[in-house]
């Protein structure tokens, strides 16, 4: 399963605004804040140096993953498509359903806290309402 429905660098919005109806549609586009959570699994990365490249306010990418351990798994990737971790399993059921239904989700880094060998990435998840 490779559903990758996100807004990265406002590409979706720019496609709409370049359309002849873009000026009418653009004011209707809004981001609805859904939830704050964190990125799970940051201690299990193959390349933990990727955690040094992220910044507060950065937009991340969500991608559904075909995962035998969690049927609702959602990968969290940086803009270069490098794995940062997952939306926590306890939080992913609604977001996976939205993504599977074709909804566009946007993620922003809200905070980064380094604790010993653990990096906690706090994120905000938004629904892009077109």
Language model region names:
Residues 1-130:
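Conserved active-site motif detector
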